[in-house]
Amino acid sequence: MEPFVVLVLCLSFMLLFSLWRQSCRRRKLPPGPTPLPIIGNMLQIDVKDICKSFTNFSKVYGPVFTVYFGMNPIVVFHGYEAVKEALIDNGEEFSGRGNSPISQRITKGLGIISSNGKRWKEIRRFSLTTLRNFGMGKRSIEDRVQEEAHCLVEELRKTKASPCDPTFILGCAPCNVICSVVFQKRFDYKDQNFLTLMKRFNENFRILNSPWIQVCNNFPLLIDCFPGTHNKVLKNVALTRSYIREKVKEHQASLDVNNPRDFIDCFLIKMEQEKDNQKSEFNIENLVGTVADLFVAGTETTSTTLRYGLLLLLKHPEVTAKVQEEIDHVIGRHRSPCMQDRSHMPYTDAVVHEIQRYSDLVPTGVPHAVTTDTKFRNYLIPKGTTIMALLTSVLHDDKEFPNPNIFDPGHFLDKNGNFKKSDYFMPFSAGKRICAGEGLARMELFLFLTTILQNFNLKSVDDLKNLNTTAVTKGIVSLPPSYQICFIPV
């Protein structure tokens, strides 16, 4: 048989199989736009603004609908009621992690972000307990954040009130907090190892949110068969994990089980306690994966929110003035802010919440997956199906947040000026997969922002009317536009 004929027959078979497979799946899944063979709905989705495409689909198909990325169905939840019903009311069924081919190559299912089942539950529980309840050594995590806030202020003083792009400095601070938590000590901002770590994290963050990675996730054959920036990501990950392994070996050589210094020590002690359990998830590979995940989850996300926050405060000097007035009243100028201050600073608390709501860092949320065949609103979602909860549809709900596209701390204040909680506040997602670093991130945002505003006035280089605060959407994240700022010592 001629090779050309064989090729045509193979392609025809693949096409027919794709059509049959999609037809069988679609019968029980929520409705959605009709997918094309092999490529699914990719031509109907704007990869530069996925949320806009999904919002348009929700207007046609309702709050629960199905789209196809390639041949893989993704069930999307739009609006508070649908997101809450899935992630909170049916939390166990929707607690899986929807892993893309790229993330599988990177994590191999290890650590805390991309793991599932028993491994995820045990590693997550241990990490939460360690981060939340245990001040490692003689220093609490709050002490470490306060130390970094002080160092951040000193770095900002070095700008001498000249215009600067705050991206690098604001990236160093959260990364150094993670270094302090996992490696025991922080780094100088000019330390070469620290700068190398920062470079790799920044590079991977940029590449992973590029359209090329979305294409690779939809057509996994490209990952192994074609050159591209995804190979740079995999190389950076390998080098970072090698560095973490070196640090783990140093910790093993100096470990004192009665005096744990940091997260790595705590994990090594847990490994020793479970050394006779052959099925234990506490091993070196999961330790390396978990430490890497702490950096991934705790560096770029917090630094981007800080950067967006300063831009919004720059744009709204009346808000900045009220925060500084509250700082003067509650904290003063001669001691460092602490977390106990937050309950006495309702306006500042509201501002931090509004920064997170408005910045809407991960509009689509990190993908989930159903852990079992799940019936949801008369639809049957097969086990393993990827789920997307559109957090942006909750954070921008106009019934809960009047004028949701306007930055307004009043969204989190009652008529008496007291802080007002909202069930719609989901920047960290919700349910069983809510971000494990939520507590640390909240602490960093409050302490970093209050410490900066305690020590500096903010000045824009441009006319405030021309200062753009509209997010730049890249991949699954929203980033603030670039800007210059002057930190004027108080």
UniProtKB/Swiss-Prot annotation:
Heme binds at C435. Its cofactor is heme. Changing K383N: In allele CYP2C8*10; reduces enzymatic activity with paclitaxel as substrate; reduces enzymatic activity with amodiaquine as substrate; decreases intrinsic clearance of amodiaquine. Substrate binds at S100, N204, R241. It is a peripheral membrane protein. The keyword Ribosomal protein does not apply. InterPro entries: Cyt_P450, Cyt_P450_CS, Cyt_P450_E_grp-I, Cyt_P450_sf, Cytochrome_P450_fam2. Keywords: Endoplasmic reticulum, Heme, Iron, Lipid metabolism, Membrane, Metal-binding, Microsome, Monooxygenase, Oxidoreductase, Phosphoprotein, Steroid metabolism. Induction: By phenobarbital. This is Cytochrome P450 2C8. It comes from Homo sapiens. The gene is CYP2C8.
